[in-house]
C-alpha cells in the first residue's frame, strides 16, 4: 500500500489487516504507563491541516508519537502558504526536507490525490494519507467506524448500517459506504432529498427518507452532522423540523434492537441530529470511535511506512 487516498483503494484483505493491527496496537498499549512503541523510530510524519480539526489531527499526532515517529504540524496560517506559496511547492519542499508521510486535510476535493501525484515525481516520495478532502472522502474515519462496529457486534459481514443526515456534504458517508460494502455490510442512507448528492444512485447503498422505518432492522446507525459551513442556501425549513424528522431522539433510540450501536463522527450538534441522552447512553459508540481513531491511524501509518505484520518490525503481539 503506497498511499491511502480513498476507501476504494483498500481490498477486503487489506482493510481487514488494518483493523486487525489496530486491535493489536490497542492490546500492546493497554496497561502501559508510558505509551510508546519503537515501530516508527527515525520516521518523520508531517500533518497538513487546512481545515479545522480536533479528533483527526490530534489522533494522527498521537498515533505517530506513540510509535516514536517525529511528528510535525504544518498549518496554512503558519506556513509559506500564507505568503502565497502554492500547495505544490509546499508539498515538494516537505518532500525535499525528508518527510516519510504527509497527512493532509483540505477543503478542496481531490487535493490528497494531487499531493500524491506531485510528490511521486521522480523516485521515492512520501506516503500520503487523505485526512479529509472537501466533501469527497475520509478513509481513516470509515476504518475506525468499521472497527468500532466489529468490536461491538463481532463482525461486519451481513450487518445493516444506517447512515443518517447530511449525505450531500459528508465525506464520511461516501467512505463508509465504500468500505462497508467491501466488508459485505448492507448500507442504507436516510436523508431529505435536498441533502443527497447527485450520483448517489451509483453508490453501493439503498436510499430512503423514512428513518423510523429503518431503525428496527439496524445493527448500527451513523448519525451525521449538518454541515452548515458548507451550505449556501436553505436545504431544510428549520433546525427543529430537521431534528423532528432525522434526529436520533430517545424515542427513536427505543426503536433500535438492543444490540445496535449508535455512532457519530463528531463534532456532534447535541439536540439537533442526536439527543444528549442517546450520545451518552450505553448504546453509544462515540467515545469508542475516538479511541479507535488513534489505533486505526497507528495501523495505517504502520502499513504505509513499514509493511505487513509479517515484516521484521511487526506490530507487537
From Swiss-Prot:
Pfam families registered for this protein in UniProt: OTCace, OTCace_N
Residues the entry annotates as binding L-aspartate: 83, 171, 225
GO cellular component: cytosol
EC number: 2.1.3.2
Keywords for the protein's UniProt record, in alphabetical order: Pyrimidine biosynthesis, Transferase
InterPro entries xrefs: Asp/Orn_carbamoyltranf_P-bd, Asp/Orn_carbamoylTrfase, Asp/Orn_carbamoylTrfase_sf, Asp_carbamoyltransf, Asp_carbamoyltransf_Asp/Orn-bd
Keyword presence, Repeat: no
Chemical reaction(s) catalysed: carbamoyl phosphate + L-aspartate = N-carbamoyl-L-aspartate + phosphate + H(+)
Binding site for carbamoyl phosphate: 55-56, 105, 138, 141, 266-267
An individual GO BP term: 'de novo' UMP biosynthetic process
The keyword Endoplasmic reticulum is assigned to this record: no
Pathway linked to the protein: Pyrimidine metabolism; UMP biosynthesis via de novo pathway; (S)-dihydroorotate from bicarbonate: step 2/3
GO MF annotations, alphabetized: amino acid binding; aspartate carbamoyltransferase activity
SUPFAM superfamilies (alphabetical): Aspartate/ornithine carbamoyltransferase
Role: Catalyzes the condensation of carbamoyl phosphate and aspartate to form carbamoyl aspartate and inorganic phosphate, the committed step in the de novo pyrimidine nucleotide biosynthesis pathway.
Oligomeric and partner information: Heterododecamer (2C3:3R2) of six catalytic PyrB chains organized as two trimers (C3), and six regulatory PyrI chains organized as three dimers (R2).
Family per similarity comment: Belongs to the aspartate/ornithine carbamoyltransferase superfamily. ATCase family.
Annotated protein name in UniProt: Aspartate carbamoyltransferase catalytic subunit
Species assigned in the record: Mycobacteroides abscessus (strain ATCC 19977 / DSM 44196 / CCUG 20993 / CIP 104536 / JCM 13569 / NCTC 13031 / TMC 1543 / L948)
Amino acid at each position: 500500500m503506497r498511499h491511502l487516498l480513498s476507501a476504494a483503494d483498500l481490498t477486503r484483505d487489506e482493510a481487514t489487516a488494518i483493523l486487525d493491527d489496530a486491535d493489536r496496537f490497542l492490546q500492546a498499549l493497554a496497561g502501559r504507563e508510558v505509551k510508546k512503541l519503537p515501530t516508527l523510530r527515525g520516521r518523520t510524519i508531517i500533518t497538513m491541516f487546512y481545515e479545522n480539526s480536533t479528533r483527526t489531527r490530534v489522533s494522527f499526532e498521537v498515533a505517530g508519537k506513540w510509535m516514536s515517529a517525529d511528528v510535525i504540524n504544518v498549518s496554512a496560517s503558519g506556513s509559506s502558504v500564507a505568503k502565497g506559496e502554492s500547495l505544490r511547492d509546499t508539498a515538494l519542499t516537505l518532500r525535499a526536507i525528508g518527510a516519510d508521510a504527509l497527512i493532509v486535510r483540505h477543503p478542496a476535493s481531490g487535493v490528497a490525490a494531487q499531493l500524491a501525484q506531485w510528490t511521486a515525481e521522480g523516485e521515492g516520495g512520501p506516503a500520503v494519507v487523505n485526512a479529509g478532502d472537501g466533501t469527497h472522502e475520509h478513509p481513516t474515519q470509515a476504518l475506525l467506524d468499521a472497527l468500532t462496529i466489529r468490536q461491538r457486534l463481532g463482525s461486519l459481514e451481513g450487518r445493516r448500517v444506517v447512515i443518517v443526515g447530511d449525505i450531500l456534504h459528508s465525506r464520511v458517508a461516501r467512505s463508509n459506504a465504500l468500505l462497508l460494502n467491501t466488508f459485505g455490510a448492507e448500507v442504507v442512507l436516510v436523508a431529505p432529498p435536498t441533502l443527497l448528492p447527485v450520483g448517489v444512485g451509483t453508490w453501493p447503498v439503498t436510499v430512503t427518507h423514512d428513518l423510523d422505518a429503518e431503525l428496527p432492522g439496524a445493527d448500527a446507525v451513523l448519525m451525521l452532522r449538518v454541515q452548515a459551513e458548507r451550505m449556501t442556501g436553505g436545504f431544510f425549513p428549520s433546525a427543529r423540523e430537521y431534528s423532528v424528522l432525522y434526529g436520533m431522539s430517545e424515542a427513536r433510540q427505543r426503536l433500535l434492537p438492543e444490540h445496535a450501536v449508535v455512532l457519530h463522527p463528531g463534532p456532534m450538534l447535541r439536540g439537533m441530529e442526536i439527543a444528549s441522552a442517546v450520545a451518552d447512553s450505553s448504546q453509544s459508540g462515540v467515545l469508542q470511535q475516538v479511541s479507535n481513531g488513534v489505533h486505526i491511524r497507528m495501523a495505517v501509518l504502520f502499513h504505509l511506512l513499514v509493511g505487513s505484520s509479517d515484516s521484521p518490525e511487526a506490530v507487537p503481539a
